[in-house]
Amino acid sequence: MVSLKACVVAYGFTLLPALVSGSPLVPRYFQKHLVSRCNISAITVQSELGPQLSNTSLIFGPDNVLFPNATERWNTLDTPDVQLVVQPAAESDISKIVKYCNDNSIEFLVRNRGHGTTTSLSAFSGIEINVELLQGITIQPDGETAIFQAGTYGAEVINTLWDQGYVTTTGSTACVGLTGPSLGGGHSRYEGLYGLVMDNIVHYNIVLANGTEIGVNETSHPDLMWALKGAGHNFAIVTSLEKKIYPGENWHQHTYTWTQDKLETVFEALNTFHKSYNGTTPPKMGVNYGAIIMNTSYSTTEAVMEWGFQYAGPGDEAEALLAPFNAIGAIAEDQFDASYPTIAGTTSETCGSAKRAISSAMTLDYNITTERALYDHFVAKVAEYPDLAATAYLWHEGYSTEGYQIIPEDSTAYPHREENHLMVFFTEVPEDSDLLEPALDWAKEAMDLWNGGQPDRLPSTYVNYAQGADYETLESVYGYESWRLERLRSLKAEYDPENRFRYFVPIISDEA
C-alpha cells in the first residue's frame, strides 16, 4: 500500500509539470480525492474497479501467488514500486483502469515483459497495468498486415506468423515484447530489408493519459504517429497495433570463435563488410552479433571473440558473402540452415532476471584501436573482479541498415538513423555482494571508450538501451537537433499535459 507520505511527495512532483505547462492549478485527477485515495487496498480496487472490467480481468496485490511473475523485471537494479497489479482481459478495460487511477490520484505503469531498464522506473509507485493477457494476433485478409495486441511478444509473434507462412520485424531477442521496443524504434534482423519495428506499423489503437481511446495513423493524429515512433513511452498506452507482415523464408547462421590475436583482422573485415553493398551491408545479412567474452573452455585469462552472422536466405548465398571471415582462422565455428523461429531463439540465453550493470553506445564504424583498448580493459577487469567475469559481455550489434536508413530522418521521432552499430556492455552483479559500484564503473568506462573512439561525434543513446545515468542526456537519446525535443514537448503539452507518462526515459521528468 502506498504510504500517505509517498502520496504527498508524488502529488507535489506531479503537480509542478502541470503548472509549468499551463494546466489548471489542480489537475482533474487530484480534484476528487487529492491524496487520501492513495491508501488503497487490493480489496478496495477489486470492489470499485472490478465490476467495470471484463469478467476474466484480474486485480491482485503482493500477497497473491501471481504477483512475483507479474512484476518480474529483466534487470532488477532499478525497479518500480508496484503496489497492485491489474491485468485487463480486453483492450477496452485499459481506458477504464486509467480513468479509475486518475480519479483516485493513483499512478499507473504499463508492463508486458518487463525489459525496461532505465533508472526512471524506480520513481514509480502505484498500479501496474499488466497487459500479458492481451495476446491476440489477427492476420488481415489481404495478407499484408496483422493486428497484434499489447501483450504479444517476440517468440509468440514469430511462431504464430511462421506457422501461417509469414514473418515480421520484432526485437532481436525472442523474449521481449513487441509493442514496448517499437515505441523506441525496435532494431530487428529484418531491418536491412524492411526497416525498424516501428517503421512497419500502420495503425495504433491507444489510450491517452486522460483515458480517451483513439486510433492513430497517417491520417488520424499524424503528429502523434510521429511521436509514437521513437518516443512513444512518453505519450500513450498502446492497446494494439497493425503492422506489415512478409512471406517467410529459412535462414542461415554461421558462428565463429576467434582468439584475441585475430581482433584487428576481424574488425577490419567487419568495417569492409558493412560497406560492401553500395556502401552499406548486404540487406539479407540481417545481423552479426559479436561478443568479447570469457569462455573458460579456451582460456581462463584471455577473452575470446564469439561472432554469429545470420542471413535471410540459403547457405550458399551467405557463405559467398562470408568468405573474408572464413579466411580468418577460428578456433571453433558452426553453420546451419534453420527456420526463422530457430534463428530468433539463438539470443535467448540472457532472458533471465538478474541485477545488471549496463551501458551502451552507437557508432558509424568500428574503431579498431578502440576495440583493442576495450579488449585489454575487459581482461584487466576480469582479473580484478573474477566474480563478474562469467556474465560480462562487450556486445556488438551490426545490423544491415539499408531498409531503415532509406526512410527520411525527420519522418519519425527516432533520431539515430545514421548510426550503423549498437554496442552494449553488461554484467550480472551477484546478490549480496559489494560489486555493484565496480560493475557500474566498468560499464561507464566501456561506454567512454566506445564514445572516445569517435571524438568528432556526439554520443548517441538508443532509448531502449538507455539506463538513465547522469552521463546520458536527453539530446543523446532523442536527438541533438533542437527542433526534435521542442516538437516532442509541444506534443506532450497537447496529449499528456499532466505528465502521467513519465517513467521511461521521460522527456519531462518529475524534477522538471
Curated annotation (Swiss-Prot):
Pfam families: BBE (PF08031), FAD_binding_4 (PF01565). Disruption phenotype: Does not affect the production of iso-A82775C. The keyword Acyltransferase does not apply. Glycans are attached at residues 39, 55, 69, 210, 217, 278, 295, 367. Its EC number is 1.-.-.-. Its cofactor is FAD. Residues 1-22 form the signal peptide. Belongs to the oxygen-dependent FAD-linked oxidoreductase family. It comes from Pestalotiopsis fici (strain W106-1 / CGMCC3.15140). Pathway: Secondary metabolite biosynthesis. It comes from the Eukaryota. It is an enzyme of class 1 (oxidoreductase). PROSITE patterns: FAD_PCMH (PS51387). Residues 77-248 form the FAD-binding PCMH-type domain. Keywords: FAD, Flavoprotein, Glycoprotein, Oxidoreductase, Signal. Induction: Expression is co-regulated with the other genes from the iso-A82775C biosynthesis cluster and probably controlled by the cluster-specific transcription factors iacI and iacK. This is FAD-linked oxidoreductase iacH. InterPro entries: BBE, FAD-bd_PCMH, FAD-bd_PCMH-like_sf, FAD-bd_PCMH_sub2, FAD-linked_Oxidoreductase, Oxid_FAD_bind_N. FAD-linked oxidoreductase; part of the gene cluster that mediates the biosynthesis of iso-A82775C, a enylepoxycyclohexane and biosynthetic precursor of the chloropestolide anticancer natural products. Within the cluster, the prenyltransferase iacE prenylates siccayne to generate pestalodiol E, using dimethylallyl diphosphate (DMAPP) as cosubstrate. The probable oxidoreductase iacF is then involved in the epoxidation of pestalodiol F to pestalodiol F, which is further converted to pestalofone A by the short-chain dehydrogenase/reductase iacG. One of its GO terms (molecular function) is FAD binding.
